[in-house]
Curated annotation (Swiss-Prot):
<feature type="binding site">
    <location>
        <position position="203"/>
    </location>
    <ligand>
        <name>Zn(2+) 1</name>
    </ligand>
</feature>
<feature type="region of interest" description="Disordered">
    <location>
        <begin position="1"/>
        <end position="35"/>
    </location>
</feature>
<feature type="binding site">
    <location>
        <position position="462"/>
    </location>
    <ligand>
        <name>Zn(2+) 2</name>
    </ligand>
</feature>
<dbReference type="GO" id="GO:0042025">
    <property type="term" value="C:host cell nucleus"/>
</dbReference>
<feature type="binding site">
    <location>
        <position position="200"/>
    </location>
    <ligand>
        <name>Zn(2+) 1</name>
    </ligand>
</feature>
<dbReference type="InterPro" id="IPR002597">
    <property type="entry name" value="Herpes_env"/>
</dbReference>
<feature type="binding site">
    <location>
        <position position="567"/>
    </location>
    <ligand>
        <name>Zn(2+) 2</name>
    </ligand>
</feature>
<feature type="compositionally biased region" description="Low complexity">
    <location>
        <begin position="19"/>
        <end position="35"/>
    </location>
</feature>
<protein>
    <recommendedName>
        <fullName>Packaging protein UL32 homolog</fullName>
    </recommendedName>
</protein>
<feature type="region of interest" description="Zinc finger 1">
    <location>
        <begin position="200"/>
        <end position="282"/>
    </location>
</feature>
<keyword id="KW-0862">Zinc</keyword>
<keyword id="KW-1048">Host nucleus</keyword>
<feature type="binding site">
    <location>
        <position position="276"/>
    </location>
    <ligand>
        <name>Zn(2+) 1</name>
    </ligand>
</feature>
<dbReference type="GO" id="GO:0008270">
    <property type="term" value="F:zinc ion binding"/>
</dbReference>
<feature type="binding site">
    <location>
        <position position="459"/>
    </location>
    <ligand>
        <name>Zn(2+) 2</name>
    </ligand>
</feature>
<keyword id="KW-0863">Zinc-finger</keyword>
<feature type="region of interest" description="Disordered">
    <location>
        <begin position="401"/>
        <end position="430"/>
    </location>
</feature>
Length: 668
């Protein structure tokens, strides 16, 4: 028996150490609402028998209020400008739209929601930075511009009176600087969890819950969520599902806990979930040296923070190699808990749940779905986001009035951090404009939206891997058909184009020119031709049952040939997701009579190991950061050092990709 857990036939009798019990340093500051949460957890609501199997559309629905609120918190924001600054920026845009200070505004004019007035578009876009060091909604290229980050627009020129006037427009420059300062302050508060010496707020909440979890039922379900997280792709949809299901578990077992207040007070942010479930993996059993593990987390947090803040350089430090490390076995070889996985698969069946509707809802009206109108879904989402913004502004106003009344009554704010953060439920965030045309980009492992050469930092095929068991099987069949299309030495891009044409012809009911109905489809994965819902048969070698449905074909059209090529053969982030994703575990629905048994086995084994070590994910994140950061002399030196080590790392992990030195400058 694992010494860190004590499990009897009736369930775990003591909270296990390691992945579930958090030992907090006495000097760490407590979250501002932790004492309130502890007080309200005194009467947990218990369920007789829970059938929670994880990763289910029952808990994460696209039309739920919780989903919209989580998406609202994951959108980047921009401080609105006053009329004088907006007029100065507008004048600069009219004089020379091709000036680097205005080329990002030009893109956002094309991608803003339908029905938005020209003035609103200007207010949403006029404060973009002139370089890639600005806010993270900045898009690198538009439909006619594929220049690299920080470069001039193709075909543009600042020669002549118009160019000189735009280059010397001090009002526009001051407008950008003042707005950037406010944006920077918001981003700084948002990135508070991305510090190595800041306590994990999720661990603090889990510690409070464990004290109130008398029969350990919540612990078993949380363990199952962690187990499934180890076999999920790192994508925006995965982060949203984890946030939603974690919130659902808290609300189900502790009905008095107002989890929504934790988000509104910014005690919890989207980056708390990135840190806990993906970057540091607080539930994972510690392997190796503790200080080395801490440094991996430190470096990963620094890279993510740099991307969110839009810094011009990548915080890369060449790792030091000790002589004794060269004689060790491959440090990137991971032993998966095969016995535990076999036990899970024996007592589960693939679910027909599908998150495609949620995927469309997330990215409707954004650059990710640039060729897909989805007008009805876009209007629905934007209206809900606007309603949340209005409610947040009203709550902020109410809180400010209460604070003023308290101060007039002699109650001073003291060292209350909420007052210094702008007060109110949103920490001053509601005073800014939600960048709805960018989408919930903070959910992504690369929290910045860029496009380049018909690719973007949001890979739709990686998102599709988090949608359903069926989509993973069809993606695997697509890859098999591409690599085995013919015996001739045909380039992969040509193979993809030919296979894609065949797939679209084979589609059971092809979509027409209108794409509106696609958002209403895909709630469940299609059944086999005989009506059988057992999806183990989909993985047959002939692929007869793994036929794409119209929704799958629609996503392939949106990704395009280049996006498919990048996903299968070029991008290390996509390769990592393909390596770690196990759709049979992720979408496995436990049989009713074995739910408790399997949960006890997962909690007892205490084994939550990903197939790729955290150091590999750190290097993958560094690669993505170098892709979207402009090239300086110092950056080029760092990039050359990094690429040498990164190529060796891919070989050690047996990951075969197109030359990374080509990919890093070609795609994003």
């Amino acid at each position: 028996m694992n010494p860190s857990t004590h499990v009897s036939s009736n369930g775990p009798t003591t909270p296990p150490h390691g992945p579930h019990t958090t030992f907090l340093p006495p000097t760490s500051p407590a979250p501002s609402t932790s004492s309130v949460a502890a007080a309200t957890l005194c009467s947990p609501q218990r369920q007789a028998v829970s059938r929670y199997s994880g990763w289910s559309t029952e808990y994460t629905q696209w039309h739920s209020d919780l989903t919209t609120e989580l998406l609202w918190h994951a959108h980047p924001r921009q401080v609105p400008m006053d009329e004088a600054l907006a007029a100065a920026a507008a004048a600069s845009y009219q004089v020379n739209p091709q000036h680097p200070a205005n080329r990002y505004r030009h893109y956002e004019f094309q991608t803003l929601s339908l029905g938005t007035s020209e003035v609103d578009e200007l207010l949403n876009c006029c404060a973009e930075e002139t370089t890639c060091g600005g806010t993270q909604s900045t898009v690198l290229t538009n439909a006619t511009n594929t220049t690299s980050c920080g470069g001039a627009v193709a075909g543009s020129s600042n020669v002549g009176p118009a160019g000189a006037s735009a280059a010397c427009d001090l009002d526009a420059e001051l407008a950008g600087l003042e707005t950037s300062a406010a944006d920077f302050e918001q981003l700084r508060r948002l990135c508070a969890p991305l510090a190595i010496d800041t306590r994990c707020n999720l661990c603090a909440i889990i510690s409070i819950c464990l004290k109130q979890d008398c029969d350990q039922s919540w612990l078993l379900e949380y363990s199952l969520l962690c187990f499934k997280c180890s076999y999920a792709p790192r994508a925006a949809l995965s982060t949203l599902i984890i946030m939603s299901e974690f919130t659902h578990l808290l609300q189900q077992h502790f009905s008095d806990l107002r989890i929504d207040d934790l988000f509104r007070h910014h005690v919890l942010t989207v980056f708390d979930f990135h840190l806990h479930f993906f970057i540091n993996r607080c539930f994972e059993k510690q392997v190796g040296d503790a200080v080395d593990n801490e440094n991996v987390t430190l470096n990963h947090l620094a890279v993510v923070r740099a991307m969110v803040m839009g810094e011009d350089t990548v915080p890369y430090n060449k790792p030091r190699r000790h002589p004794q490390q060269k004689q060790k076995n491959n440090p990137y070889h991971v032993e998966v808990p095969q016995e535990l996985i076999d036990n899970f698969l024996e007592h589960s069946s693939p679910s027909r749940d599908r998150f495609v509707q949620l995927l469309f809802y997330m990215w409707a009206g954004t650059g990710v779905m640039s060729t897909t109108p989805l007008t009805e879904l876009t209007h629905t989402k934007f209206a809900r986001l606007d309603a949340l913004s209005t409610a947040s502004e009203r709550e902020d106003a109410r809180m400010m009035i209460e604070e003023e009344e308290d101060e007039e009554g002699g109650e001073k704010g003291g060292d209350d951090p909420g007052r210094h953060n702008g007060g109110g439920t949103s920490g001053g965030f509601s005073e800014s404009t939600l960048k709805k045309n960018v989408g919930p980009i903070y959910l992504c492992p690369v929290p910045a939206f860029f496009t380049k050469n018909q690719t973007s930092t949001v890979c739709l095929l990686c998102e599709l891997m988090a949608c359903s068991y069926y989509d993973n099987v069809v993606l695997r069949e697509l890859y098999r058909r591409v690599v085995s299309y013919c015996q001739n030495n045909v380039k992969m891009v040509d193979r993809i184009q030919l296979v894609l044409a065949d797939l679209l012809r084979e589609c059971t009911s092809p979509l027409g020119a209108a794409h509106e109905d696609v958002a209403r489809c895909g709630l469940e994965a299609p059944t086999s031709p005989g009506g059988d819902s057992d999806y183990h048969g989909l993985s047959g070698v002939d692929g007869a049952l793994a036929r794409p449905d119209p929704v799958f074909c629609h996503v392939l059209r949106q990704a395009g040939v280049t996006g498919i090529y990048k996903h299968f053969f070029c991008d290390p982030q996509c390769a990592g997701n393909i390596r770690v994703t196990n759709e049979a575990v992720l979408f496995g629905r436990l049989h009713p009579h074995h739910v408790q048994e399997v949960k006890l086995a997962i909690c007892h084994d205490n084994y939550y190991i990903s197939r790729l070590p955290r150091r590999v994910w750190l290097c993958i994140t560094l690669f993505k950061a170098f892709q979207i950061t402009k090239r300086t002399y110092k950056g080029k030196v760092h990039l050359a050092d990094f690429m040498r080590d990164f190529t060796q790392l891919l070989e050690s992990c047996d990951i075969k990709l197109v030359d990374p030195t080509y990919v890093i400058d070609k795609y994003v």
